[in-house]
Amino acid sequence: ASTAGKYASAFGIAAVVFAKTDPAFSDKLKERALAAYRLGREHPGVCQTAPGVSPYFYEEDNWHDDMELGAASLVAATGQKSFLNDAIADARAEPVTPWMGKDTANHYQWYPWHNNGHYEVWRHGTAAQKAQMASFYRRGLEAVVGRANNGFRMGIPFIWCSSNLTASFATQAYLYRKMTGDNRFREYEAAALDWLLGANPWGVSMIIGLPGSGTFAHDPHAVITSRMGLQLTGGMLDGPVYRSIYGNLKGISLHNADEYAPFNTGFIVYHDDVGDYSTDEPIMDGTANLTYLFAAMAGAR
């Protein structure tokens, strides 16, 4: 269901996008969305990746969020309210994305990091359903803020892909504010974005090329940069990790002297080095997450 729900939501959203410009194609996409959704209902549970030679894989443990988004997307694609009931049932099964409030997690254990399904249910739901979805978002935000007792107002766990979690927190805070008009988390939303753009212990933006006049990674773990010399503008990096994680990863080593050594003395570390795949690798899903958030913010101006 964790994979089928993702497919159902992708095809369902695409069916809506192409409904007017290419109705025949839209119908085919809708059929595939429904087929994927049925598969997920028939096979509840998770489908983890199976690595060939890599020592690491994506250890996803949750699936209700995927089926919730799949069902909510089918509400828009089909107009059938029965899918809304399914989505609400899944939302109630996992009201808060489990990493929120935790200090650690396995690699991609609770994915996606942000549950957009709650927002999609809110868009289609009754007043009572809208209020419940907003309360689910609020509970998650409160859990993270409860751990943000530091100068950077950061309450996320610094596991692998911490930038993903940071962007996801900011996304959820933004959507909660949009849904409710409640600004109580706005300073933490801003702090998360500030962190990604360079207001962090290293003074380094976690987004390559942004801001243009700022400090960002020039030696990321990316073959396009290391072999072709091309800048991956807009790519969001994994971000800092706990020292304990970095120190125990296999096959990792710095190729150059650590230019940020004076700032890597605490419990989290970051290196702008092609050899550090844990903190300096551009990530596609995180970049997509951030693109969604930045686009929403631009549209709201």
Model feature map: region roles:
Residues 1-36, 43:
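A conserved hydrophobic secondary-structure block that centers on an alpha-helix together
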Residues 1-6, 10-14, 54, 60-89, ...:
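Aromatic (Trp/Tyr) and acidic
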Residues 20, 26-30, 45-64, 86:
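N-terminal carbohydrate-binding/catalytic regions of secreted carbohydrate-active enzymes
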Residues 47-52, 96-100, 145-156:
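Acidic/His metal-coordination segments adjacent to aromatic residues that form catalytic metal sites
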Residues 56, 102-103, 156-159:
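A ubiquitous short alpha-helical element
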Residues 100-109:
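Zinc-dependent metallopeptidase catalytic helix centered on the HExxH motif
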